[in-house]
């Protein structure tokens, strides 16, 4: 005998289901659930008098070795490039084990995930689950960036640096084997996944190759060290040999050539361009046109995301500090001014919305804010909906109902998850909510989505959480703030975080030589990438910049946006 209950009551008990919509934070973005893998009337819920008890929703006979998961997140809404759906998510051995319907098959049909005595439960009802974010533009200036990033849902940090040295404050580079070794050892105490860039500036192969063999996952070419065509070509030769990525910050002053010369030096080889709009650095005024090439994986940094009435004004001072410039030297001021163009910044948000710019990142403490990658990505999505209206898949493929924002949500979630992972050769391990992936996951209350997570899970264990006073009688009394949890302590940290290395470094025995105890994974599959491999962000139109007005056109049509006066996900969330 079936029993019907009102949809609102069902959502209160078990969370919303297929066809229901959820507002994300205080934005104008609405998520619609496309599929529900749970079974109506057979939902598993934990608590007093609830379903997950021995002999009911929990099987009391099977051991952990008999496919019993370590953790099940129940009835959670997944927002991922793979889809927007509701399911039970099982974690085992630090990985996503199964996605489907949890319960006890002895009493329930259609069970994919068997809950047992070895299983912990995280209640996902009325919550949203995303993959842990990946920030591919990290200046490792301060280790305090790590908790700031985790508190916004970032679980992987890729970049370079040695601390607050001038080279690091300006460039994402860990130069040479000695510094790479020390930073890999320092990463042993950081509860995030780590990958390091070496210095991509040499006129011979071996000074670059030795950094890859020392453990770098790629090389960074940066104008402050000289973004010359020879450095670009030599770095790409080494990258092709070792299957690593080259990240590039091109020549703002056009001293070594123009954007066309850089494109010729790249010569069709895959490359990851940083702050491709140009305010963060790059050929003035038209580096942005490189985003239309099929071998370029273009990223933005968050100082210019989203475009607001304050964006232009705040950039000059940031630039002077980050690039060791002197405000008393007219040439230094002119250099800074040349990078800040309202017209190209106004086009940047639109290029993200069109799927031309593919990745968002921070540029941490070097103009960007490491704890705002997720927030600012969704602020751009909201601004674009307000200014450009609904966004639908040009292929005509369905993504929920016509009223939902599902296609736009998949495009934007991909920018700091799967696409960042693909660009760095990490996508077989992290970057999405898929079976077999490392269990780096973020749980959000929809009202706080993109701003403050409820839980951050690293390698299957809770690393950070919204937690109340530790001396209180329950976990929820104010002040509730993001605090470190057990995955960040002791040896658990090393078993829940990954250090990415080149395959050459692993083959050379670097982990044993340095005494590394963390999980070690190689980057791979990079040199055969094209922009078409990026999810929901693979467009390659013709982009042009008027050399006099700086107006940007895409396939001959001008693209621009208006600066926002007010943003969602902002002051009302940060009163305390």
Curated annotation (Swiss-Prot):
Residues 132-576 form the Urease domain. Its main location: cytoplasm. Ni(2+) 2 binds at residues 220, 249, 275. One of its GO terms (cellular component) is cytoplasm. The modification N6-carboxylysine is found at residue 220. Its EC number is 3.5.1.5. It is found in: Cytoplasm. Substrate binds at residue 222. Binds 2 nickel ions per subunit. GO terms for biological process: urea catabolic process. It holds the Pfam family Urease_alpha. Keywords: Cytoplasm, Hydrolase, Metal-binding, Nickel. It catalyses: urea + 2 H2O + H(+) = hydrogencarbonate + 2 NH4(+). Heterotrimer of UreA (gamma), UreB (beta) and UreC (alpha) subunits. Three heterotrimers associate to form the active enzyme. This is Urease subunit alpha. The gene is ureC.
